[in-house]
Amino acid sequence: MNHLIGDPGSLLDQFNPKYIQFISDNNIRQPSDIFVFLGEHPDTINDGYYMNRFHEYKWGNLPASYHNGATALSYADGHAATHHWTVTGEHGTIRPPVKGAVGGIIPAKPITDFQWVVDHSSILK
């Protein structure tokens, strides 16, 4: 679940202070652009939230790419869609799961896919 939707407590709010934390769905200005749920890559699943520190341009939580290089997302307006990732290679968004691999902190190089996630997680305050 997108950590900027709902009230995750003080721990997660502090990592992206320049972005709006949507406590109520009535406050989401562009609900068709903001995702609520997305498929997370199995190597970075560690809790119930999907969270990255936007200013670092590093994946802490990586999106899944099961669906031919895409993941499924549900949005705040109720629609669902898939998004195809573009970055492959060593630092790519598209990567196979590695059994036993846990944790992230993968540089987002180039930042194309990372920026897409930022742009669809919230908006600047």
Give the role of each language-model region.
Residues 1-125:
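Short, well-structured segments within or immediately adjacent to enzyme catalytic domains
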